[in-house]
Structure formats: structure tokens, C-alpha cells
Amino acid sequence: MLFHVTHTHDYQTCMAHREEARNEFNDGFTKAAAANNVQIMATYNNRGRHTPIWILEAPDYHAVDKALEPILKFGNYDIVPVSAM
């Protein structure tokens, strides 16, 4: 299944200028995705809006939820199943 995931945070919680937090966010998500059989198909970022977007392939919604678990403290997540047209 494909999923469109939108992450949002605000200026105060932005990781752009906090290297340790950025590494925790990136490493935590990458490792948890691999551990839960979630493939990161594409990554996009709207820096001005503090909004990263991912296209993920996963067996189910639960796998995506588990992959995001280590980074939940960094903001909000909207997970939407999608399909190719």
C-alpha cells in the first residue's frame, strides 16, 4: 500500500538549526521504517511552511504508525492511503 504522510511543526520546534534533533528525527524514522518493512519512496519538504512530506510503501497503516513512533514528539502527522493513477 502507498501512503502520503505530511508532517508539520512550528518555528519553535523546527529542527533546521538543531543538529542533534535533526539527526534524531532522521535516524529514528529511517531505522524504524526499515524495522517495520516501510519503504521511503519519496521525500519532499516545504521549508517555509515547516512541512516535510513522504510517500511511503508499507504493508498496512499499522506499519506506518510504528515507523513514525520514534519521531512523534517532533510534531503532527497526517497519514493518508493513496494509489497511483
Model-derived features: positions:
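Short, solvent-exposed amphipathic alpha-helical segments in soluble enzyme
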Residues: 22, 70-71
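A structural signal for short, well-ordered beta-strand segments
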Residues: 5-7, 54, 79
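Short, electropositive alpha-helical surface patch
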Residues: 55-68
